[in-house]
Amino acid sequence: MENMRFSLKALRINKGLRQTDLAVELGVSRKTVAAWENGKSYPAADKIDGICKALGVGYDNIKWKA
């Protein structure tokens, strides 16, 4: 069975979070979250675990834009 993968934005919206909510939880700016969602930058390793916890998913369930 293949793992289901969803975009960071879709997961955030599904969780009922605004970019600002996720940013505050992770200690980054809203613009940083927007850049991650748009594939303009990639989260640092120390933020990835927090993203997964905040969204309630594993790393393999997030479709990271390159």
Segments (PLM) and residue ranges:
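A short, Lys/Arg-rich alpha-helix, primarily the initiator
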Residues: 1-14
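Alpha-helical residues within the helix-turn-helix
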Residues: 13, 24, 53
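Short alpha-helical DNA-recognition segment
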Residues: 16-35
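DNA major-groove recognition helix of helix-turn-helix/homeodomain DNA-binding modules
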Residues: 44-61
